[in-house]
UniProtKB/Swiss-Prot annotation:
UniProt protein name: Tyrosine--tRNA ligase
CDD domains reported in the protein's UniProt record: S4 (cd00165), TyrRS_core (cd00805)
E.C. number(s) listed in UniProt: 6.1.1.1
Chain's gene name: tyrS
Function: Catalyzes the attachment of tyrosine to tRNA(Tyr) in a two-step reaction: tyrosine is first activated by ATP to form Tyr-AMP and then transferred to the acceptor end of tRNA(Tyr).
Reaction it catalyzes: tRNA(Tyr) + L-tyrosine + ATP = L-tyrosyl-tRNA(Tyr) + AMP + diphosphate + H(+)
Disulfide-linked positions: none
Gene3D superfamilies, per database record: HUPs (3.40.50.620), RNA-binding S4 domain (3.10.290.10), Tyrosyl-Transfer RNA Synthetase (1.10.240.10)
Subunit structure, as described in the record: Homodimer.
S4 RNA-binding domain residues: 336-396
Protein localization: Cytoplasm
Primary subcellular site in the record, as a coarse category: cytoplasm
Segments carrying motif 'KMSKS' region: 226-230
Length: 399
């Protein structure tokens, strides 16, 4: 096991906050594996790179010799996390949650070591609680304290409804830490209130309080808003290798260091060397290629990553693209779906043709076939091909 100082440095890499650091240091000094918990509500069937920020941190804890608990919130998923929400989320059925949970397990083991991962479902203990147990749990916190949360406070002051079951969510998440006897809990910055609840409940139930590591919310491909499938600025971990590669090599230069810190397993020394190389004149795209290859290999294997790189770098092969590829600039105020970009760039006659080509798999971006969900990020440049004869190197510029 690494020294306490070395462990702490890796734990703090990319982290927003460690609470309470001095307590965590004392736990590390004991030289015993700690129980590290991170919970995920399976509210959707697929994960994107934003979700993997926490999973990557779990892997780092595994590599340090600690016991990782991947908690699937099949019980809390039916409540719906109110964190950051302006309205009550519709609850999912048990069947929906379990179906999504199964795909989560398949996806996370692309990062985590299955032999060193304890998979838990919070319904295991929550389904056993009696009404009296729930009343005892609810008695640990007051409504006034709940309303200290920004999201609840905003809804309360604007007369937006807050359902009673939403107050239960932080309590249930906190009780998960009691049930699992967690030493450390990981979560996004938007989860801090819930994570602190775990500390308080553990004390109430006679346990040593867990420490908290909060991780930032990963920016999407636009470099501004958090990564979200609904915003179209995401990289899905089950996307085709070529699409994943194409998206990653096209991120803004300013975003690549953030992605290296939160998504890459390269050492900080190696990343700092990349920074120095760029400062000394290296092409940022060459560095982004290293990032893209690493991430594609993680989810699809080394061969798929090599093939994606080869396809993107071999556009002139067999006359696929003309040597005098036209440079096209499209003005926009925000990210655009690929169909709109093709239309504005003049690579298709109209929106209907763009849709037809996308539906038939006849649109390529940087050598990879894309579908209608591909979002062209503001500031990005891609080589686009629509059909067999329409090509262009398209840049989406801010208007």
């Amino acid at each position: 096991m690494k020294s306490v100082e070395e462990q702490l440095a890796l734990i703090k890499r990319g982290a927003e906050e460690v609470l309470v650091e001095s307590e965590l240091v004392e736990k590390l000094k004991r030289g015993q594996p700690l129980r590290i918990k991170a919970g995920f509500d399976p509210t959707a069937p697929d994960l994107h790179l934003g979700h993997t920020v926490l999973i990557n941190k779990l892997r780092q804890f595994q590599d340090l010799g600690h016991q990782v608990i991947f908690l699937i919130g099949d019980f809390t998923g039916m409540i719906g996390d109110p964190s950051g929400k302006s309205a009550t989320r519709p609850p999912l059925t048990r069947e929906q949650v379990l179906e999504n949970a199964e795909t989560y397990k398949q996806q996370v083991f692309k990062i985590l070591d299955p032999a060193k991962t304890e998979v838990a479902f919070n319904s295991t203990w929550m389904d056993k609680l009696t009404p009296a147990d729930f009343i005892r749990l609810a008695s640990q916190y007051t409504v006034a304290r709940m309303l200290e949360r920004d999201d609840f406070d905003k809804r309360y002051t604007t007369n937006q409804p807050i359902a009673i079951h939403e107050f239960l969510y932080p309590l249930v998440q906190g009780y998960d830490s009691v049930a699992l006897k967690a030493d450390v809990e990981l979560g996004g910055t938007d989860q801090k209130f819930n994570l602190l609840m775990g500390r308080e409940l553990q004390r109430s139930y006679g346990q040593e309080a867990q420490n908290i590591v909060t991780m930032p919310l990963l920016e999407g491909l636009d470099g501004v808003k958090k990564m979200s499938k609904s915003l179209g600025n995401y990289v899905g971990i089950q996307e085709a290798p070529g699409v994943m590669y194409s998206k990653l090599v096209s991120i803004p230069d300013t975003l690549m260091w953030r992605y290296f810190e939160l998504l890459s397993f390269r050492s900080m020394e190696e990343i700092e060397q990349f920074r120095a190389d760029v400062a000394n004149g290296a092409n940022p795209r060459d560095i982004k290629i290293k990032l893209a290859e690493e991430i594609v290999a993680r989810f699809h294997g080394e061969e798929a990553a090599a093939n994606a790189h080869r396809a993107a770098g071999n556009r002139m092969k067999e006359g696929e693209l003309p040597e005098d590829l036209p440079e096209i600039e499209v003005a926009a105020a925000e990210d655009l779906p690929i169909a709109a970009v093709l239309n504005r760039a003049g690579l298709v006659k109209n929106s209907a043709q763009a849709r037809d080509l996308l539906n038939s798999g006849a649109v390529k971006v940087d050598g990879a076939v894309v579908d209608k969900d591909f979002m062209f990020v503001l500031g990005a440049t891609h080589v686009c091909q629509a059909g067999k004869k329409s090509f262009g190197r398209v840049t989406l510029k801010a208007e």
